[in-house]
């Protein structure tokens, strides 16, 4: 009898092991199988939601075939407790495992409402937009100046809405003073700012931030980004460059950034200043003279006066030979790369051509002819 019981128990164990193996294999297959939904969808996870409520809701949306299997997958991958509040874009035909990964990894919002804070040389704008998962495009719903006395109610209400993404966009050529002042005005950030960052040390870029992030942490990210860009560019520099230090590269890049807004011209403008440095010629660049007058705290908004061109400041490159003592703005990555890897030319001069670009010249005679040509056209 004991042998019979042992035999039955052994048979049952084999059956259970076989059943579990088949069940695990079937479950894994279901978790990895493509979803049946043919269009991407934006799913919002509320703060405090658990895997049970989320799986039930996803099943109602027909994004998953079984909430039970979904929960098993989340438990098996040890992600049941890692749900992140926010809005997440679920691509068409995503498997259950892919969905689990999307709504638990990192917690970075990928769809829904987005607030853009655009900091430019002369403006600070808030743009609110919604992402349409079906078209893959954004629809702008709000656009206003953050300095306005009265903010739109629809913008104020966003502070109580979960899953809203916030992004700060810094344009190239904005001074540190202006960036810091704009960061102080950002009502979705917290904390104080104790100092103005060194000119040139903040990387123009796009930064996603969380609501309530500290201002100091955002500024630190900008500084770290610029340090990273500069150090990598310095390592790949043209070894024939007359620039002796990364700081000198940053100074020249800032001048290039203010002299041209055309990406295709950066290398040419860089070549002019590089050639002038090699020939021990004064740089004679207006933006540096202007910085000596404004320190980046305002836009001059007019041409330089003759008296200003002879005013003795460290930034007057019509009087002083060599680079100014500091950067004159925060240059972008392309300007930094251009400063360290300029085009190979013999150009020593350039003048604005009246259409956003410049006319370049190898000698003073040609340059003067270009100046007269564009002056006559602009009369």
Listing of model-derived features with the role each one plays in the protein:
Residues 243-245, 249, 263-322, 326:
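Small-residue-rich helix-loop
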